[in-house]
Amino acid sequence: MKVQERFLKYVSIDTQSDPSSPQFPSTPTQIPFADMLAQEMKAMGLSQVERDSTGYVYGHLPATGSAHSSSGLAFLAHMDVSPDAPAAPVKARIVTSYDGGDILLNPEKKIFLSPADYPVLGQYQGQDLFVTDGTTLLGGDDKAGIAEILTAAEYLLQHPKIPHGPITLCFTPDEEVGRGVDHIDLSRIPAAFAY
């Protein structure tokens, strides 16, 4: 699956966290998303994939070639999105080859994304942009990270001649409310370095 397709699929799923909830994860919507990620990871061929009782998802990509003795590496990303703005329903789309002008996000509500308001947009002229209809968050933080990590893992699995050390993946709930590592099981992340 291409990273763009994966990202659009992920942002369409509501995983907004709730800082007022005493539960962990703070919202029940994060668990089905975690289960879906675990199924994808198993289907692509990652080993030791598990969604634990607190909603964390772990998976492993064994070392290849002469890299078996290399130190382990881990990649982490969080599944929840910010509770600070509406997060559903996300109506994401791609603006192809952005022309540098205003982007009409929502014709009914006359919502625009304008370089006059956000001058940084000018840096992205000619590139493809992911946007919403302006009524919700996109969810790029951190579903873009999940999409990138899983797409890279899938690529390495499909190209086993590329040498790499052992890689662990971990996806966490509730980072946006400051509880992302409250129940993480570090024994499942045998890595010298994590990003």
Feature annotation, model-predicted:
Residues 1-129:
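Acidic/His- and Gly-rich active-site-bordering loop/insert found
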Residues 122-195:
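Acidic/histidine-rich catalytic neighborhood of metal-dependent amide-processing enzymes
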